[in-house]
């Protein structure tokens, strides 16, 4: 993924509104989740934590032309995962025949597509550029439908020079609200990722959810992407946004090199009664051929430990 903005730069940009305190975390969780299950291994039968894999995990090999999207589907069989999140960057085309071939290959191999993922930036000061972004999202909603996938990951992006956080949020709300009206007619959910830019803070993600107010919108939750602040570390921000998670991307190392406490993360998903995919998104230094299986095995073990499946 692209290099992040520095924490100080981010906080300077968003100002006081970025301070996600414990009250927000508790309020967001308690207002949407009614589960009383504990986080003890194997006790939460409401959560359905399913192991998946992002095509992005093989980005090094895909960029080098050593793998294709067809190979990613075949890798899913080797890994024993239920689904693949199809990152759009390496599609040969968006022609119907190509998309149909991917869908058919996945069906024959017993693999489903948990979703598709595109790179977008809705924080455009120019209205004509925002219109172009909306059309691009609509295009990929159609692609997602052709694949038979239920979910499309989008980005909000970084603020342009001179723009305020509230402007960026408004531009994103205006664009994604219309996009959700389109995707909803096809039964496709849009998930904005807490990725580089305005959505690296839980409060902004929650504001987007509440202002867009669509059953076809939520948060594509990457557990390593939130910028920790004194009032809320990454784990607190994960918990705050979990009730609205549409898909989860899993890495085991934060950007600063610190290991993620996965045994702390999984109970949060269990208590929130999350039902969906925990998709490996490997970005380590090790070759993906050996690094991805190791991450997938960690995810499988934890899904069995904290889920009914």
Predicted feature residues:
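Short active-site-proximal "capping" loops at secondary-structure junctions
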Residues: 58, 89-93, 121
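Charged helix-capping and loop-helix junction motifs
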Residues: 67-69, 98-101, 130-137, 166-176, ...
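Conserved beta-strand positions in the central sheet of alpha/beta enzyme cores
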Residues: 85, 115-117, 153, 249, ...
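Glycine-rich, proline-tolerant flexible connector loops at the mouths of alpha/beta enzymes
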Residues: 85-103, 159-162
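Short glycine-centered, acidic/aromatic-flanked micro-motifs in structured strand/loop junctions
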Residues: 88, 120, 156, 192-194, ...
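Short strand->helix junction
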Residues: 91-92, 123, 255, 285
């Amino acid at each position: 993924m692209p290099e992040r903005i520095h924490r100080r730069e981010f906080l300077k940009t968003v100002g006081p509104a970025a301070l996600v305190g414990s009250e927000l975390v508790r309020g967001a969780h308690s207002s949407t989740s009614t589960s009383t299950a504990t986080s003890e291994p194997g006790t939460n039968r409401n959560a359905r934590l399913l192991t998946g894999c992002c095509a992005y995990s093989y980005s090094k090999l895909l960029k080098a032309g050593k793998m294709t999207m067809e190979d990613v589907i075949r890798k899913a069989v080797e890994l024993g995962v239920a689904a693949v999140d199809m990152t759009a960057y390496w599609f040969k085309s968006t022609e119907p025949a190509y998309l149909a071939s991917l869908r058919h290959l996945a069906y024959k191999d017993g693999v489903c597509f948990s979703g598709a993922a595109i790179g977008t930036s809705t924080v455009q000061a120019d209205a004509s550029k925002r219109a172009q972004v909306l059309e691009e999202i609509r295009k990929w909603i159609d692609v997602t439908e052709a694949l038979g996938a239920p979910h499309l990951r989008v980005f909000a992006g970084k603020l342009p020079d001179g723009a305020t956080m509230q402007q960026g949020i408004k531009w994103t709300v205006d664009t994604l609200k219309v996009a959700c009206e389109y995707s909803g007619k096809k039964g496709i959910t849009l998930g904005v990722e807490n990725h580089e830019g305005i959505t690296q803070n839980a409060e902004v993600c929650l504001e987007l959810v509440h202002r867009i107010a669509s059953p076809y919108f939520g948060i594509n939750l990457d557990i390593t992407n939130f910028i920790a602040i004194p009032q809320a570390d990454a784990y607190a921000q994960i918990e705050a946004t979990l009730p609205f998670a549409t898909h989860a991307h899993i890495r085991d190392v934060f950007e600063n090199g610190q290991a993620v406490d996965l045994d702390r993360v999984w109970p949060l998903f269990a208590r929130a009664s999350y039902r969906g995919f925990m998709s490996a998104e490997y970005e380590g230094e090790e070759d993906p051929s050996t690094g991805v299986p190791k991450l997938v095995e960690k995810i499988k073990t934890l899904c069995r430990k904290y889920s009914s499946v």
